[in-house]
Amino acid sequence: MRPASDGSGPAAGARVAAFGLGGGWAELRAVDPAELAVLPDAVDLGTAATLPAAGVSALRAVRRLGSLLGRRVLVTGASGGVGRFAVQLAALSGAHVIASVGTRARGAGLRDLGAAEVVVGLDEVTEPVHAALDNVGGPLLAQALDLVAEHGAVIQIGAASNQPTTLTLAHKLVNKRLDLFVVGEGLTTTPNGVWNFGPDIALLAELVAAHRLTPHIGWRGPWHRAPEAVEALRSRRVAGKAVLDIT
């Protein structure tokens, strides 16, 4: 870590995390200080690496739902990187969280993260929900819309199923909101047009340090094992995030 030439940003040698839209594999990269968060001593770099993309995505999506205190919130793809953060952040916001997963095995540990209910698919969900955070897409997205009460919302964060979604007039979209989530949308920018991710990353890191947020690393290894990590992710053998250590 080298400080900015104008003296702004963290000091030399600071441990930082950033959301980088490009240059993530470079040995050196210029980063606007607004993109950076200085990490608490209790948060190691591997753990911090899970926060900028998955953590910030979940945080921004949960915020878009407004007040969640006492409300039923559905999270699909809850065992994935974004899903696990979404479960925890919605629960921290006071929601009754229903975590949907693909198999019983992938639901392990989600109650410990704050889920009030863990279900396989959505057939077990029989009562309406105030909102849904969807990471799966495909037919499950249409089913989630059916479950959302009038004036509720579905935020589609991802489409892990890689399947099309068919929506009909029966979904009554006039009385429901369907948002396609983009992580940078709504974020303030610096005068140079850089997204101001730093404060959100810092908040997540503080929650981790306080043991209020638990990143789940399902695979971790040296960077030369990257092909192994990719294959584990593609075959859905990783719950949470995969982390490569570069030394």
What are these regions (language model features)?
Residues 1-23, 135:
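Glycine-rich beta-strand-centered segment in the early N-terminal region that forms part
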Residues 15, 72, 96, 152-154, ...:
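Short glycine-centered segments of the SAM/dcSAM-binding site in methyltransferase folds
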Residues 16-77:
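NAD(P)H dinucleotide-binding glycine-rich loop of Rossmann-like/cofactor-binding domains
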Residues 51-121:
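Mid-domain Rossmann-like dinucleotide-binding core that forms the NAD(H)/NADP(H) cofactor-binding site
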Residues 124-132:
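A short acidic, Gly/Pro-enriched loop at the edge of an enzyme's catalytic core
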Residues 139-212, 246-247:
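Glycine-rich phosphate-binding loop and adjacent beta-alpha segment
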Residues 205, 210-217, 227-247:
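C-terminal capping/lid region of NAD(P)-dependent oxidoreductase domains
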